[in-house]
């Protein structure tokens, strides 16, 4: 595990010495001598990105839903209601943190925390540009796929610990849904890994760079890539409990699902984990199939659009914008498609997506072997 950053010759010497001192001081507390100071420093931008995604993700969803329902949405707090989410955060901070008398207090308390950790640990391997990645693992894609299992533990702990039948029903539905759809999602991502020849997410980005912009992206290099791309996008909706796969939180059936009994900051943490997962799966789609931090603009003659929009800052801009685009599509689908029944959801997974995922895997292998 390493922290990769481009050298900054203009960085003040005092700042460099301070960071080295903090890193040396914290190294002894990290497992296997890992420079914990660097990991803490690397985590700071990720925290801001996550909070940014939450703040404007919630605001964006309210505005999108209002537009589709011919409403204005939030308008009172700040210009065009842009501070509404901050007002909601302040409201949640003031709400009482209630623990039901009959609840298993240990499971009830750790459930949101485990869910949050499972959602945001994947951010460590997401490359937000050629100059920055928290943990450059050579199996980063495999890590991102597997870390979802922690979310299952958190959801089940929250549902069981609440000692509420609606919460338990919602947790069981969510666990069954996530575990089932993880199979076609993983196979679809392995198709992208097969095209790249590596599980290193930074290397996957590098292999999709070039002067022709989007023409170098895996999605446009092979006509077969569209199949695993669509399979993973559909499966990611189910993994994040987004419509039309939101049966674990069906208000008309289960009140609010596995977080029915939660209030205050515990509810806010669950909410943060949900929007963090939305951005995480959107970023993975962008990295594996759409070039990640690479610019989609091509060089056209003497107009070097790709060269002008490439670099560390541009890289972060492109991957965040691509991620937000897929978040917008998720929100769009929520207010467009009706909710599936449980039997329809499982039918789609096991009899449609999973067989097509295996077919796409075989076709991708054939394409990589026989097509130069």
Curated annotation (Swiss-Prot):
Protein's recorded name: NADH-quinone oxidoreductase subunit H
Pfam families hit by this protein: NADHdh
UniProt source species: Chlorobium luteolum (strain DSM 273 / BCRC 81028 / 2530)
Top-rank lineage group of the source organism: Bacteria
EC number: 7.1.1.-
Record's catalysed reaction(s): a quinone + NADH + 5 H(+)(in) = a quinol + NAD(+) + 4 H(+)(out)
GO annotation terms (biological process): aerobic respiration
Chief subcellular location: membrane
Compartmental location: Cell inner membrane
Record's GO cellular component terms: plasma membrane
Recorded GO MF terms: NADH dehydrogenase activity; oxidoreductase activity, acting on NAD(P)H, quinone or similar compound as acceptor; quinone binding
Functional description taken from the UniProt entry: NDH-1 shuttles electrons from NADH, via FMN and iron-sulfur (Fe-S) centers, to quinones in the respiratory chain. The immediate electron acceptor for the enzyme in this species is believed to be ubiquinone. Couples the redox reaction to proton translocation (for every two electrons transferred, four hydrogen ions are translocated across the cytoplasmic membrane), and thus conserves the redox energy in a proton gradient. This subunit may bind ubiquinone.
Cysteine disulfide links: none
TM region(s), chain numbering: 34-54, 106-126, 139-159, 178-198, 217-237, 269-289, 313-333, 352-372
Family assignment from sequence similarity: Belongs to the complex I subunit 1 family.
PROSITE patterns: COMPLEX1_ND1_1, COMPLEX1_ND1_2
Coiled-coil ranges per UniProt: none
Membrane topology category: Multi-pass membrane protein
Keywords (A to Z) from UniProt: Cell inner membrane, Cell membrane, Membrane, NAD, Quinone, Translocase, Transmembrane, Transmembrane helix, Ubiquinone
Assembly, per entry: NDH-1 is composed of 14 different subunits. Subunits NuoA, H, J, K, L, M, N constitute the membrane sector of the complex.
Keyword Translocase attached: yes
